[in-house]
Structures are given as structure tokens and as C-alpha cells.
Amino acid sequence: MLGKTIGKWLPMMAAGLIFLSGCAPVVKENGKTMPRIDGEAKIEWNRGKYPLAVETLNSHGEKERQVFYSPPKRVVAVWQNSIETLLALGVGDRIIAGMGVPDGKYIREEYRADYEAIPYKSLENLDTETIMMMRPDFIAGWSSTFTDKVLRSTEFWNERGVHTYISQNSDPANRNRTIENEYDDILNMGKIFDREEKAESLVKE
């Protein structure tokens, strides 16, 4: 089912990439009104697979390898494709903030309950300071996510021990936006979260 959904994501990304990069303003939340997001998801994972290296993009559109010593447990996900991919992989309980979706009705019905369980959900992006207070260990989003106007650069987060992942088709320098790139993103997420079999089944659907 997710494979069919990708076909819908891709035209939207190709046609609206420039517009969407600026349509979700950064919003500074009052710390007193933010939900407390303590602790982390209890997970089981194959320790023999880690450390593992995954190739991703940085804020300059350059490919680089990030090394993971364990699957992420406190995730910030930006835009619907990032959020739904994580929900489809069965790791929605690790998302502490999901941003870029105007309403839960836009999430696929089978993932909606898990989406609603995410502690913080909003169309608007949180500001950098608030996200740092949430103590994420992984941020997934688009190229436009990792700019000074939104959540700062990938380097900013990597220097603070936070892994990042940029959707390949969101790179403005990439003129070849394909479903295969989306499949690669799903497979990479599967590796990062120790959900490789699930990721492979998703791209075959």
C-alpha cells in the first residue's frame, strides 16, 4: 500500500517543492505549553547489525555517510512522506514530533491512529531551540527543512550528536525525481531502524 502512496507523493514533491519549502512557518512554542516527552521508546534490535553506515545528503546537497550505533529512539519527522514511512515501518512510537501535515485526515487511514499518538503534531515547524529541548537523536525531512530559516543545517545537528536524513527527491539540484529514489529512502530508513524486511516488503507492494 505504501508503494502506491509514493506515486501520489512524487508529483506533489516535484510540482510543489519550491512552494512548500516556505509555506510552513517556524513557530516558537512556549515551553510551558509543550507536552512533556520524557523517556524513550523501548525497542528490540539486532545489535549485530550495528554500527552501520548509511549514505544521505547534507544541507549542501552533497552525499555523505552517517554512522549509526543503534536505531534512533527520539525522532523528529518533517513532511508527510517522512512521517508515513516511519509509521509504515512500525516505529511511530519513536516519533516525538511530526510536522508539516495540516490535519490527521491526510494521513493514510491505516496509520492514522499511530499518527494521532505522536506527542506533538502541527503543520508549523517548531523553532530550533524548542526542538533541542526535546532531545531528538534523529531528524528526517526535506532539503528545505535543513536551512537557516527552518531547522538549521545538517551540520548543526550532526555536531550535536543528532543524525539527519534528507529525502533524495527533495534536493532542489536533483532534476531526476523518481519513485526509485523514494524506494531507496524507505530501504535506508529500514536499515537505520532495523526494519529491513518490512522496508523491502513496502517497496514491493
PLM-predicted stretches and their roles:
Residues V76-M134, F138, W142-S144:
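A short, structured surface patch at a secondary-structure boundary
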Residues N58, M99-P102, Q168:
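Residues at the C-termini of beta-strands that transition into short coil/loop
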Residues C23-E84, E197-E205:
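Bacterial Sec-exported substrate-binding components of ABC uptake systems
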Residues Y106-I107, T147-L151, R175:
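Extracytoplasmic/secreted cell-surface and envelope-processing proteins
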Residues R74, Q80-N81, M133-A140, T145-F156, ...:
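Active-site-adjacent structural elements in enzyme catalytic domains
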Residues S153-E205:
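Extracytoplasmic substrate-binding proteins
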Residues L2-V27:
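Sec-dependent N-terminal signal peptides of Gram-positive bacterial secreted proteins and lipoproteins
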Residues K73, G92-I95, R135-D137, E159-Y165, ...:
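Loop/turn elements at helix/coil->beta-strand transitions in domains of secreted/extracellular proteins
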